[in-house]
């Protein structure tokens, strides 16, 4: 190991410890300048390339997944440790597949599956960006589809479609009535604010 202080190539190991994450920490001393420094040894993993929707290929990035999860879980009761655990689980899944290339669509589905177990609202947020809906109508239809709603517990839902249903019924009422006659606005059921 090259000394970071003088550049000399010879050193001796004073102490070796295995860390909780499986890496090895070594305390070293340069034989030339007697400076001490620490090194950490970890296994180098070869991540596959990601094939994007437009056909581009880019290296797998844990940071990108972390950033997407943090945005989806913003202001939700999800800890950073939980998010990190999901990132590590997805990374391990990607490596264990043993492929040199993997589609971004497949990774997106895996992220959605993990978020589905973690937090309902974060799952909906991620799905709304990942699925790239062309308009609100398509988003509402997808929400009504079992694919996105099968996770909502009927006894204690975190997400209510009442307001979305109300908006859709109001749109259809406006199309049926004369455009000169304004339709009366009503509120969806729920708590009133003063």
Swiss-Prot record:
Binds 1 zinc ion. Its cofactor is Zn(2+). Residues 48-138 form the ATP-cone domain. Residues 185-194 have a biased composition (Pro residues). One of its GO terms (molecular function) is ATP binding. The keyword DNA-binding applies. Residues 168-179 have a biased composition (Basic and acidic residues). The keyword Transport does not apply. NCBIfam families: transcriptional regulator NrdR. Belongs to the NrdR family. Negatively regulates transcription of bacterial ribonucleotide reductase nrd genes and operons by binding to NrdR-boxes. This is Transcriptional repressor NrdR. It comes from Bdellovibrio bacteriovorus (strain ATCC 15356 / DSM 50701 / NCIMB 9529 / HD100). The gene is nrdR.
């Amino acid at each position: 190991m090259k000394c970071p202080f003088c550049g000399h190539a010879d050193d001796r190991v004073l102490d070796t410890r295995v860390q909780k994450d499986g890496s090895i920490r070594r305390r070293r001393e340069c034989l030339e300048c007697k400076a001490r420094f620490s090194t950490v040894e970890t296994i180098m993993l070869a991540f596959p390339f990601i094939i994007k929707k437009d056909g581009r290929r880019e290296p797998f990035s844990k940071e990108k997944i972390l950033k997407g999860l943090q945005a989806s879980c913003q202001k939700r009761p999800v800890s950073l440790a939980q998010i990190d655990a999901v990132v590590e689980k997805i990374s391990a899944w990607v490596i264990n597949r043993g492929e040199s290339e993997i589609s971004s669509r497949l990774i997106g589905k895996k992220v959605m599956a993990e978020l589905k177990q973690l937090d309902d609202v974060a799952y909906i947020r991620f799905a709304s960006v990942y699925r790239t809906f062309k308009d609100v109508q398509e988003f509402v239809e997808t929400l009504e589809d079992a694919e996105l709603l099968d996770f909502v517990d009927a006894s204690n839902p975190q997400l209510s479609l009442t307001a979305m249903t109300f908006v859709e019924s109001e749109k259809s009422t406006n199309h049926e009535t004369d455009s000169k006659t304004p339709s009366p606005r009503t509120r969806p059921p729920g708590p009133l604010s003063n």
